[in-house]
Amino acid sequence: MHLLIAAAGSGSRMGADCNKLLLQIEGEPILKWTLESVALASSIKWIGIIGQPCDKHAIMQIVQDFSKPVQWINGGKTRQESVQKGLAALPDEAIHVLIHDGARCLVEPELFDQCAQMVLKGVAIIAATPVVDTIKTVDSNGYISGTPDRSKLWAAQTPQGFSVEQLKEGHATAIAKNWNVTDDASLFEKLAWPVRILESSPSNIKVTTPFDLSIAQSIIAMKRQS
């Protein structure tokens, strides 16, 4: 299975002056923790890291002794554009692909393997967890306009897995129709293509804010102690 890791984000919401994936948890960069899980996922045979050119040296230093083939891919201005560039850089033999946020450093290796197994069966899949809070929709004036049925709400995560051919078609359509999406499953939704949910752990958070970082630090520290 081929894996693309989105690593082109900034540290703006983290309040950092560098790519948040280079911030450290327990003495190791966030991206290193993500890659440790990738290394233990038996299904993953090739990794493409999509990042900004200014971060290439630092990120390639992290993967210099990695046990699996890693390719650097220059990212775009948005996540959507970065994934497009990642798809274009896949080896010719790639038939299926998993997309993962580099900032989801608490991902379990088994989740990659479970997603890969589903994708190889021809199922588009995303990791997700049921929403536990009551969610409100709000109008432009800040007033509540509705309460969606919580039993139908799931928080999307990564990995997300697809047929390479289908995902490329989805991105090509997005360019033609000027669609802007925040994850790849949204392209499938817009095209009325089915995507299945694979329930994952609520701990598979995307480290985006200082609060997220503190949670990740606590969980990794507890894992080390155990």
UniProtKB/Swiss-Prot annotation:
Any one GO biological process: isopentenyl diphosphate biosynthetic process, methylerythritol 4-phosphate pathway
The keyword DNA repair is annotated on this UniProt entry: no
PROSITE patterns reported in the protein's UniProt record: ISPD
Alphabetical UniProt keywords: Isoprene biosynthesis, Nucleotidyltransferase, Transferase
Record site feature (Transition state stabilizer), residues: R13, K20
Keyword GTP-binding attributed: no
Broad EC category: transferase
Pathway: Isoprenoid biosynthesis; isopentenyl diphosphate biosynthesis via DXP pathway; isopentenyl diphosphate from 1-deoxy-D-xylulose 5-phosphate: step 2/6
GO molecular function: 2-C-methyl-D-erythritol 4-phosphate cytidylyltransferase activity
Gene3D superfamilies the UniProt entry points to: Spore Coat Polysaccharide Biosynthesis Protein SpsA, Chain A
CDD domains to which the protein is assigned, alphabetical: CDP-ME_synthetase (cd02516)
Any matching Pfam family: IspD
Reactions accelerated catalytically: 2-C-methyl-D-erythritol 4-phosphate + CTP + H(+) = 4-CDP-2-C-methyl-D-erythritol + diphosphate
Xref: InterPro entries: IspD, IspD/TarI, IspD/TarI_cytidylyltransf_bact, ISPD_synthase_CS, Nucleotide-diphossugar_trans
Residues at the site labelled Positions MEP for the nucleophilic attack: R150, K206
EC number: 2.7.7.60
Function: Catalyzes the formation of 4-diphosphocytidyl-2-C-methyl-D-erythritol from CTP and 2-C-methyl-D-erythritol 4-phosphate (MEP).
Entry similarity comment: Belongs to the IspD/TarI cytidylyltransferase family. IspD subfamily.
Protein name in UniProt: 2-C-methyl-D-erythritol 4-phosphate cytidylyltransferase
Organism: Prochlorococcus marinus (strain MIT 9211)
Gene symbol of the encoding locus: ispD
